[in-house]
């Protein structure tokens, strides 16, 4: 005879995806119809950020091993996810300023500025700024993850390591890095010129890095325009500067050398 308890414990679609917990994680703080959409969209963003960080960690491992083909496949996946993240802005923009204002006060100090996963992503892209740690308690997981990401090699550091495995003489990156985003380096650009002139797999990997940088910048632009059309120049929730801060993040490349070298190709 079949054991009934064994049947009840069998893996199902719902249990594998933890759907009971997942679908119970939306807890609106008002009776406003549109608040659920706001929560769902932002939770989906966090899931995508988790996947992007997961993929970029894998990407760095492949680059360190000199596996250009696997790196290209992983970058393609990340770029496709970023397109999905950007397209999601269309959904949140179906909410009018009046609809958002109806429940905005219920957010209290909660703000997207506090997204630890996005700060980890920024650190992986190369941002080195202790101000990113300010919103998080020092003994909390968010603080630890961001600090660890800032202490680890950035994606561009990993790209340089990959280029070294392909026979290119890459300059040593000084540690600790200056605060902020990576600054252009003529020594790095000379190496990149060699890479592009060789026109091999390494050049393709560099081009996908340009796509990654562009994809993140596209997300930033769509995000700031969404905030502007929803709350204008009002301060963000939690006392953040809102659209004004977001505008300050536009057009700052994560990989400036890959952009600077293009004029010499």
Swiss-Prot record:
One of its GO terms (molecular function) is metal ion binding. Heme binds at residue 223. Its EC number is 1.13.11.11. Pfam families: Trp_dioxygenase. Substrate binds at residues 38-42, 104, 237. Pathway: Amino-acid degradation; L-tryptophan degradation via kynurenine pathway; L-kynurenine from L-tryptophan: step 1/2. This is Tryptophan 2,3-dioxygenase. It comes from Anaeromyxobacter dehalogenans (strain 2CP-C). The gene is kynA.
